[in-house]
């Protein structure tokens, strides 16, 4: 069971829906639920649980404790270091937040870290994130990179066939999905201008 703690649609697509598709392709079954709809009754229907960007709540805390009691495995999945203010405080966008917004944002960051530390293992997208997350849990930190779904691949192939190419132009698309990543693209702009 994937427990989604993210309100944005694109992270959920890559880290929940696409991983469910991967599991189904291997003959397994999987479902998802938004974290505020999680119920202790769901413990009896699944052997493993993946908490994606899930902030701690009393229900989440009790659920993980009960899962551990029944020898069921809990993973925390995240594709960004929004689990500790030592990482997020350096982001320009976060620094420019109003005091009220920053307080709310930091509360979410700290609550996600608490869920992370209660889980036995973690799943992330890169080696660098793996190394950082290992500082917070005793179990394994596995890498499962973001991938395109079967539908995305099919649509991309159709779009490639339909496009009229202009050999005199180079078109670059950057789709980070997060305003906090704008600084990342700024790093390559000087090279692109050349």
Show which residues each predicted segment covers.
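Conserved catalytic-core segment of nucleotide-activated headgroup transferases in glycan assembly
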Residues: 2-28, 146-194
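A short, well-structured beta->alpha microelement
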Residues: 24-42
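Short N-terminal targeting/anchoring amphipathic segment
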Residues: 42-59, 73-77
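A conserved, positively charged/aromatic
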Residues: 43, 90-97, 113-118
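A short beta-strand/loop micro-motif in the catalytic core of glycosyltransferases
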Residues: 50, 118-126, 175
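Membrane-proximal helix-turn-helix segments that form the acceptor-binding/catalytic region
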Residues: 65-69, 99-122
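Active-site proximal beta-strand in glycosyltransferases
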Residues: 68-97
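Helix-loop-beta element that forms the nucleotide-linked donor phosphate-binding surface
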Residues: 118, 129-150, 155-157
């Amino acid at each position: 069971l994937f427990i989604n703690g993210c309100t944005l649609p694109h992270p959920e697509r890559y880290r929940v829906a696409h991983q469910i598709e991967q599991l189904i392709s291997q003959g397994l079954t999987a479902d998802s639920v938004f974290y505020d709809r999680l119920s202790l009754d769901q413990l009896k229907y699944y052997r493993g649980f993946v908490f994606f960007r899930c902030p701690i709540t009393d229900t989440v805390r009790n659920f993980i404790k009960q899962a551990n009691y029944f020898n069921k495995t809990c993973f925390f999945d995240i594709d960004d270091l929004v689990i500790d203010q030592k990482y997020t405080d350096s982001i320009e966008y976060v620094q420019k937040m109003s005091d009220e917004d920053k307080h709310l944002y930091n509360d979410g960051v700290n609550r996600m870290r608490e869920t992370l530390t209660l889980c036995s293992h973690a799943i992330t997208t890169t080696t660098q994130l793996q190394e950082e997350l290992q500082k917070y849990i005793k179990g394994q930190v596995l890498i499962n990179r973001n991938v395109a779904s079967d539908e995305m691949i099919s649509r991309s192939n159709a779009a490639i066939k339909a496009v009229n190419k202009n050999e005199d132009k180079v078109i670059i698309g950057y789709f980070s999905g997060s305003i906090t990543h704008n600084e990342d693209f700024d790093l390559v702009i000087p090279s692109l201008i050349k």
